[in-house]
């Protein structure tokens, strides 16, 4: 068992609240550190001691399987004492404000808090009220930085680079924090980004984020190296954004016919959870061009890298 990685990278930030604000050097450093953890996680002994004696609280106000489990595994493999707080047991359901919750948790002296919340900006509010480091595990439609990092790692490992690639992000861009974080990261790293969706699922002024816009799959996937599908986030929809699920799949669901519009060696990604038969069919999701399972594996490595990089900034680290 070793206590540290070969990489000496230290993230120049106390928190990870978003991709926005990270430099190219920050992103590259996190991806390089993640590579070390990919190899560690494939060994029999997956333990490190770099977070021994540290307390990590996973604070999830929205249901999560992949992200919460991934952060829990990441923390435990680094030797942290990990506590998962369920929203059903939180005092916020009894009327306590988020600020009160933050101050209560801060009194327990956690070193790292990992938070997911349905409100954009909630994680930043928490970060202003606590002494430890805060990681954004998704806040509303704002950002999901570790998802963008694991997506970038997956792409880089399979394509050898990010610079110059064309990444088509397809589906419910309007409600997607994953799309926003990926757009920021991919643009920073020199990739071309094209968003593909019906007009009702595109944020107004999305072009200002430096993306190309297409409103049908033939145009959208033309020349794409990576096809990243997004699910319909019906829990965030207050009205009718698509006529029907079947019609949406007909025009925007990824099947073999539509995938053929992309480059022959194009690879398929999805942040999960997938709605099979809505934005993607099973043949493509489980096919040879799919990286979806690999994304899950990369998630643990990336979150280990983020936890260690932030822990190196903690007092007495």
Curated annotation (Swiss-Prot):
Record flagged with keyword Membrane: no
Lineage: superkingdom: Bacteria
The keyword Transferase is annotated on this UniProt entry: yes
Reaction(s) the record says it catalyses: carbamoyl phosphate + L-aspartate = N-carbamoyl-L-aspartate + phosphate + H(+)
Alphabetical list of SUPFAM superfamilies matching this protein: Aspartate/ornithine carbamoyltransferase
GO cellular component terms given for this protein: cytosol
GO molecular function: amino acid binding; aspartate carbamoyltransferase activity
Keywords in alphabetical order: Pyrimidine biosynthesis, Transferase
Binding site for carbamoyl phosphate: 66-67, 116, 144, 147, 272-273
Annotated residues for binding of L-aspartate: 94, 177, 231
The enzyme's E.C. designation: 2.1.3.2
Pathway listed: Pyrimidine metabolism; UMP biosynthesis via de novo pathway; (S)-dihydroorotate from bicarbonate: step 2/3
Entry's Gene Ontology BP terms: 'de novo' pyrimidine nucleobase biosynthetic process; 'de novo' UMP biosynthetic process; amino acid metabolic process
Record text on subunit structure and interactions: Heterododecamer (2C3:3R2) of six catalytic PyrB chains organized as two trimers (C3), and six regulatory PyrI chains organized as three dimers (R2).
Entry similarity comment: Belongs to the aspartate/ornithine carbamoyltransferase superfamily. ATCase family.
Function, in words: Catalyzes the condensation of carbamoyl phosphate and aspartate to form carbamoyl aspartate and inorganic phosphate, the committed step in the de novo pyrimidine nucleotide biosynthesis pathway.
Name of this protein: Aspartate carbamoyltransferase catalytic subunit
């Amino acid at each position: 068992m070793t206590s540290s990685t070969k990489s000496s990278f230290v993230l120049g930030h106390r928190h990870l609240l978003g991709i926005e604000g990270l430099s190219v050097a920050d992103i590259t450093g996190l991806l390089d550190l993640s590579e070390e953890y990919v190899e560690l996680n494939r060994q029999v002994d997956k333990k490190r001691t770099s977070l021994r004696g540290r307390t990590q609280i996973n604070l999830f106000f929205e249901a999560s399987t992949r992200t919460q489990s991934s952060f829990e595994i990441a923390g435990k493999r680094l030797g942290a004492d990990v506590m998962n707080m369920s929203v059903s047991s939180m005092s916020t359901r009894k009327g306590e404000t988020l600020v009160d919750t933050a101050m209560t948790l801060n009194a327990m002296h956690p070193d790292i808090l990992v938070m997911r919340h349905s409100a954009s900006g909630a994680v930043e509010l928490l970060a202003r009220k606590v002494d430890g480091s805060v990681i954004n595990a998704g806040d509303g439609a704002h950002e999901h930085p570790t998802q963008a990092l694991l997506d970038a790692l997956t792409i880089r490992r399979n394509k050898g680079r990010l610079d110059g690639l064309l990444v088509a992000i397809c589906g419910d861009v309007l409600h997607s924090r994953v799309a926003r974080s990926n757009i920021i990261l991919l643009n920073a790293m020199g990739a071309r980004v094209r968003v593909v969706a019906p007009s009702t699922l595109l944020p107004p002024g999305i072009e200002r984020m430096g993306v190309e816009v297409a409103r049908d799959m033939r145009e959208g996937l033309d020349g794409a190296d990576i096809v990243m599908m997004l699910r319909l986030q019906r829990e965030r929809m207050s009205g009718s954004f698509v006529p029907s699920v079947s019609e949406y799949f007909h025009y925007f669901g990824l099947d073999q016919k539509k995938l053929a519009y992309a480059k022959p060696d194009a690879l398929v990604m999805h942040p999960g959870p997938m709605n099979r038969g809505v934005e993607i069919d099973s043949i493509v999701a489980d096919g040879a061009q799919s990286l979806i399972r690999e994304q899950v594996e990369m998630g643990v490595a990336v979150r280990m890298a983020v936890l260690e990089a932030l822990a190196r900034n903690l007092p007495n680290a």
